[in-house]
Amino acid sequence: MWVLVWLSFIDNRFEHYQLGVFGTEAHCNKAKARAEVMVKNVGQAVACFAVDRN
């Protein structure tokens, strides 16, 4: 399982939002490419993380 998240660390404040859950890395990366518009400065990012359900 892959999780797409938006991360922000600005002015010593950390925020994050889960944007989606995907069955494959390829699907997550496709959604990540569309979500890049949410990144407005160097303190922000979108990323896919692998999650092991076991």
Regions found by a protein language model. Give the residues of each.
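Short, surface-exposed coil-to-beta transition loops
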Residues: M1, F14-Y17
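A short beta-strand micro-motif
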Residues: M1-S8
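Short, mixed-charge low-complexity intrinsically disordered segments
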Residues: H16-G20, R34-N54
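Short amphipathic alpha-helices within nucleic acid-binding modules
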Residues: T24-K32
